[in-house]
A protein has these predicted regions:
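Short linear recognition/processing motifs and adjacent strand/loop elements at protein termini
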Residues: 1-213
Length: 213
């Protein structure tokens, strides 16, 4: 049979999965926070979010576009983070910022409002692990399958610091991502706070999102 590395295909479906509706730590630890700064993002229709750290930067990605007041957002996150920048993209909203040392990140949702908390002290809000499986199609070609509920549109980002392409899959759930990176010859899954993020190391990789439920 053909190995996964040889097939060079990734298929990520959105399927049915039983998830917790809330992260209990979010409320239980709120009284222990020493410092907290919050970024609020209001939308008029359902929008999905991904968040991850790469190098010294924190990335926040939505799969819909909105022009943000980056000056106001920068004031909101000081002094826990700095250098907030919105990367141009007509289909998505992409923010990159530099958090301070030991800054924790949590994501909350209130209706159509997304809130990203930066904080010190207290316990980290745990990220629930996205399961990733190897499966085979009718032609016996291997692919990766992630049974994710409410995955959004794929967002491709050019990382100006490193010079490569990041493929981001935002979710409509909170604190659900990859806690340990997966490394393959042709691509990497990197650690995330929310969503899935792939780094390509080859040109012939494809991602598909769908609904198997």
């Amino acid at each position: 049979s053909q190995s996964f590395e040889e097939s060079k295909r990734i298929i990520i479906y959105t399927g049915k999965e039983q998830n917790d509706n809330a992260v209990a730590e979010e409320e239980n630890n709120s009284h222990t926070l020493l410092k907290v700064r919050s970024l609020s993002f209001s939308w008029n229709q359902p929008t999905n979010i991904a968040a991850f750290k790469r190098g010294k930067y924190l990335w926040i990605v939505f799969d819909r576009h909105q022009n943000l007041d980056t000056k106001e957002l920068s004031e909101n996150i000081a002094p826990l983070a700095k250098d907030l920048y919105q990367l141009p993209n007509p289909q998505a909203t992409i923010l990159r910022l530099t958090p301070g040392d030991d800054i924790k990140v949590g994501i909350r949702k209130e209706g159509l409002l997304w809130i990203v908390d930066l904080y010190t002290g207290g316990k980290s809000i745990p990220t629930r692990e996205v399961p990733v499986f190897t499966r085979y199609d009718a032609l016996n070609r291997a692919y990766l399958f992630a049974p994710v509920t409410d995955a959004g549109n794929i967002v491709s980002i050019f990382d100006p610091e490193i010079g490569d392409i990041i493929s981001v899959i935002p979710f409509n759930t909170t604190n659900y991502g990859i806690t340990m990176p997966y490394n393959y010859p042709d691509f990497d899954f990197i650690k995330t706070i929310n969503g899935l993020v792939l780094i390509y190391k080859a040109d012939d990789i494809s991602i598909t999102t769908g609904n198997s439920g």
